[in-house]
Amino acid sequence: SLWEWGQMILKETGKNPFPYYGAYGCYCGWGGRRKPKDATDRCCFVHDCCRYKKLTGCPKTNDRYSYSRLDYTIVCGEDDPCKEICECDKAAAVCFRENLRTYNKKYMAHLRVLCKKDKPC
């Protein structure tokens, strides 16, 4: 769920997820369209595609899942029905950490009308 993913992002990046990633670029936040602006935005694009493909088995009304941290690694609950969603969220949080160096504040609260050319999953 959004809560668990937010906690993963905070632990991986040290950044508050909502101001930093809530409306970043063309894909971070609700919805998403067109071409990702940079590597961080691409993390969100891949995350959106991943979640869209992995919704089976996880109740749409409650997508909360269990996970833990082993050393510095996120471990999704093995028998959790939403494990695949957890794996999507984990991959995005790690992607954000790996791309902190190229994070660009000019894409925070980016206007979606400025996004160009459609890019399907």
Swiss-Prot record:
The record's CDD domains line, in alphabetical order, gives: PLA2c (cd00125)
Tissue occurrence:
Expressed by the venom gland.
Where found? Secreted
Please describe the relationship between pH and activity.
Answer: Optimum pH is 8.0.
Taxonomic superkingdom: Eukaryota
Q: Which sites bind Ca(2+)?
A: 27, 29, 31, 48
The note describing how and how many cofactors are bound reads: Binds 1 Ca(2+) ion.
- Identify one Pfam family in the record: Phospholip_A2_1
Disulfide-linked positions: 28-44, 43-95, 49-121, 50-88, 58-82, 76-86
Name the job this protein performs: Snake venom phospholipase A2 (PLA2) that exhibits myotoxin and anticoagulant activity. Displays edema-inducing activities in mouse paw. Also displays cytotoxic activity against some cell lines and myotubes, and antimicrobial activities against E.coli, C.albicans and Leishmania. PLA2 catalyzes the calcium-dependent hydrolysis of the 2-acyl groups in 3-sn-phosphoglycerides.
Assembly and partners are described as: Homodimer; non-covalently linked.
Record protein name field: Basic phospholipase A2 BbTX-III
Organism field: Bothrops brazili
